[in-house]
Amino acid sequence: MKLTKLQNIIFPSQKRFIPYTRMFYYGEGMEQSADKEYWGIAEYHAVDFAAYFNSFSIKKWMKYTKIDNVKICLTMKGSFKIRISGYYMNRGPFQEEVLSEESFSLDEKQELILDIPEMSDQVTIVGFQIVGYKDCCLYSGYYATEIAETEKREVRLALATTTFKKEDFILPNIQLLKDEILNAEDEMAKNFYVHVIDNGRTLNKEELECDHLWIHPNPNTGGSGGFSRGIIEANLQKEPATHVLLMDDDVIILPESLKRTYRLLTLLKEEYKNHFISGAMLYYERMNEQHEDIGYVHDDGSYGPVKHRLDMQRLDAVVRNEEPWAKRKNQYAGWWYCCIPTTVARLDNLPLPLFVRGDDVEYSLRNHAKFITMNSICVWHMGFTLKFNAAMELYQVHRNSLAIQAASGICQNIDFAERMRKFTRVELLRFNYNSAELLMDAVDDYLKGPAFFEKPNGEQILKEKGAKNEQFEPLSKFKNIPVDLDTVYGDGPRGRKEKFIYRLTFNGLFCPDFMLKKEPAVIAYDWFYAPHRQYLRKKLLAVNPHMQTGAIRTLDKKRGKELLKRYRKTFKEIEQRQKTIRKKYQDRRAYMTSYEFWKKYLGI
């Protein structure tokens, strides 16, 4: 049987990864040679490769694929010892199970093929450690398996990435894909395709296109339109793709993640062939920190990761990430890196036209998706942590939440309308009138029915709603207001009298001005609700502690009363019309997810 490569051993060759070497290996005393031919390990120094990118998730590989053996193949020279170990969690701390140890003395460069021995069923990941003795040189390495060619699946993997004027990201990524995959002389190069959906229509087709890579100018129809176009092109290419990998444009990628995805697909067992491979999103700003590999819709209608944040420089996190986690209701895969078989991603099963936000959630839930995740299959995404965009989070997310629930019958345990009602009330109580309007706009537009979504006006709508975003200035502009950034996310206790007056007067909306305090109170700018801090104030300073910016909010009794009247009318209307409007979305969903619809919508 032929030796088939599963994972390459990789090193932090790019400058951006130098501060994060512990994602690749642990230990000191390893340096790359001047000619970059090998990595030298100093005498009596140990380097451990049981790290995020170089450990092997053996339990998952054995579960999901047809392999029944794994080997470590290392090209080395010199004197050294290799220890192979397995790791697993044991009621808290991780445990190491030493599987083998062997010393070598090689006068010439030589490839070693080491069998990974049998291990206990508890072992989740395996890795290896090299202890250098004399002139120890590591040239390259990989994990492999012996398997018959007839056991492999035919895979044609099409990457579809949607971009909108983000050349700083998309152009380097295109070049990386050409250099590392498309121009390689191997099996994957023949079966890998790239569709760049150019929503901004700013990329030069003639300069960028090559064999197996296409630029598709597209109207700006957001992620939904871009990824729908990508799925369409993957299905219609000369040799139709077996899988389409949806990926954001503003990400940092490692080609090795794509290679591991491809190899995984070629070896999947029959019962897992329709699973989605959900790549993890790590923070661009803190590259060692994993934000999410699978998300879920919480019972309160919010969205978030199944797992808590994990520091992938820590071995315990690397092990824990591959252990089973409690399954949540309404799980989904984010489209920063999501590989879907075209038995699911078909021309008659395209995304809903939501422009942005919620399309990936709806698609996973509509298709009852099951997921495979794995260490090192990931991207780094920027901008998730520092800025709250009200037009996006309050209007777009909530409008789409109502629409996907209505159209696809998902998340029936969640009352999105009630969530929006509560949030609207909170925004009115803290004088954030534009945000209250955005939430009610979301309800109003949802109530217009599916015809509203069938018009390609997403860009214009988001621009109009974006004009309602709060305008922040540096905190230096508010020197007369004392701000403690460490206590912004905090609130004091409230007594019965304070609660009663707060509710009775709607936090000052229905009380005389002499009862209101003139000094502005400092509150958090985003989701955090602090009724005690904002109690009976004329002004509030909403602070973003991450960016050290703020915005003044002022009690406006006239506008507040008008919006309160609209608030009562809006949420009464959705309560009365919900059953009827849901039926309209349900009846129209098949058309809105069809090739016929998307051809017209995209003008192709």
Regions found by a protein language model. Name each.
Residues 256-305:
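Conserved donor NDP-sugar-binding/catalytic core segment of glycosyltransferases
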Residues 140-149, 374-391:
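Active-site donor/metal-binding and catalytic loop motifs
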Residues 308-338, 388:
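A recurrent flexible, glycine/aromatic-enriched loop bordering the glycosyltransferase active site
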Residues 333-337, 342, 346-363, 371-379, ...:
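Donor nucleotide-sugar recognition loop
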Residues 207-225:
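Conserved donor nucleotide-binding strand/loop of the catalytic core
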Residues 166-185:
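Short, well-formed alpha-helical segments that are part of the catalytic scaffolds
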Residues 1-121, 125, 399-604:
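Terminal low-complexity segments of carbohydrate-biosynthetic enzymes
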Residues 239-252:
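Short beta-strand-to-loop acidic/aromatic patch adjacent to the donor-nucleotide binding site
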